[in-house]
Amino acid sequence: MLRQFFSYYKPYKTLFFLDFFSAIAGGLMELSFPLIVNYFIDTLLPGRDWGLIIATSIGLFAVYALSSALQYIVTYWGHMLGINIETDMRKSLFDHLQKLSFKFYDNNKTGTLMSKLTNDLMYIGEVAHHGPEDLFIAVMTILGAFGVMLFINWQLALLTFIIMPIVIWLALYFNKKMTKAFTTLNKDIGDFSARVENNIGGIRLVQAFGNEAFEKERFAVNNQRFRVTKLSSYKIMAKNGSISYMLTRFVTLFVLLCGTWFVIRGSLSYGEFVAFVLLTNVLFRPIDKINAIIEMYPRGIAGFKSYMELMETEPDIQDSPDSKDVSGLKGNIRYKHVSFGYDDHHNVLNDINLSIQAGETVAFVGPSGAGKSTLCSLLPRFYEASEGDITIDGISIKDMTLSSLRGQIGVVQQDVFLFSGTLRENIAYGRLGASEEDIWQAVKQAHLEELVHNMPDGLDTMIGERGVKLSGGQKQRLSIARMFLKNPSILILDEATSALDTETEAAIQKALQELSEGRTTLVIAHRLATIKDADRIVVVTNNGIEEQGRHQDLIEAGGLYSRLHQAQFGQMVHR
């Protein structure tokens, strides 16, 4: 894990060494102060040479000025190093998340992933700056201070250093406990973020059902668990801090008592005694730094472990080494003995065989859960078939690059996702870099002109979080405009009009028919009236493809489609 962590320093070697050696130089200057005080008391005071005293004072001031400059470098440039590494890691993680399939997101909470991208990486950034530097300098300062102490009085130095093994043992002990505590804390932060994200994202549903009290109770459970975990980690920190404080102050008292005895015996001068006490304080500073590391390291370690677990999650759907870019596909689709299950225990689709001709409109109907949407989701490789193969124009979709395959397929869903931003940005998402002329052409084709002209800022009107300022029909038209701009060879309409009123549905259907012209179109619908003009209707059940044919042929066959049609239109007449 350390090798993986330090690999992120490679692009910033110069910055790392600037920060590292500045911190080392600053630490060495700290050691010089007690020696200069010793020189003042034992040499300059008895000699009463004001010229030498002033010269030494100026030299000490220069040391302090240089130390201040080094402190600035360590604080600013050192944090720049940490921020750069944090930024690189966040970019790598975000890029990696773009490669993961729908299956991964089906099994992971959005709030947890958000926490990994934000909180975890902030802790890692702090460790990247302070970690190696602080640990090395702490050890170096302790050894340097001990060396000077030995030079002044080796007996007192050895007596003072007896306490160090206890301090080191405590550091290792509390570091282990803190790592465990912060691993749990990071998980709780993820759950906490997921709860808040769910509530805020679904606030309209919460208020519509009047379930605010229920949501408060659920939030209180997560909030309390987060509180308890955080308190337990701070309890460990408090124990570590208080015990370390007691030990270091005991050492100070010990040095004062023993040092006084050595002075009275005449084996230690006054200047050496004061220098020794000051060196004891220099010795404590890295111990305090080690305590800070004990608090910081576990957060960073837990965050980095979580980061690496996510980075090591291999995309289950990715380009094969021999995959090639495709363009200008006609849209001849063939499913050959295709099976698929969302888990290893149950298949949604079993041994599906289906051929679709280029330019053909094929509608999929059947009971919920039979696999209609799943069948279509396998085509752009949102999910991977567990058995069999799917080809387009005779080429296996596994032999096409994902970007070029998905560039040839457009999906219009019932639940349209829109980004926070303007109408223009959401339409242009269909083809990044599209010209103004192309965007307006798509607006006209989707019958969005009236909406755009009625908006206060036209195409530059902000539509709110996920398009909250637009109606369902307006969202659908915007989605269709986006698809006109993309201009795919193959179109998937996933229950695109099932939640709209009759008038809006008719307008959307007209736009969809225009969009479907000349394209291979796969339609998933519950409302059979919308697909009676399809070239072919495929009835999908839990047993696979039950029957297929044109609307009238299936009605006359008296099979499942006929019964579904009779049940649906019988209900409509009854109503």
Curated annotation (Swiss-Prot):
UniProt keywords, alphabetically: ATP-binding, Cell membrane, Membrane, Nucleotide-binding, Transmembrane, Transmembrane helix, Transport
InterPro entries: AAA+_ATPase, ABC1_TM_dom, ABC1_TM_sf, ABC_transporter-like_ATP-bd, ABC_transporter-like_CS, P-loop_NTPase, Type_1_exporter
Biological-process GO terms, alphabetical: transmembrane transport
Annotated positions binding ATP: G366, P367, S368, G369, A370, G371, K372, S373
Record field: transmembrane: 16-36, 50-70, 132-152, 154-174, 243-263, 264-284
GO CC terms of this entry: membrane raft; plasma membrane
Segments forming a coiled coil: none
Membrane-protein topology: Multi-pass membrane protein
Domain (ABC transporter) ranges: 333-567
Protein name (record): Uncharacterized ABC transporter ATP-binding protein YwjA
This protein's encoding gene: ywjA
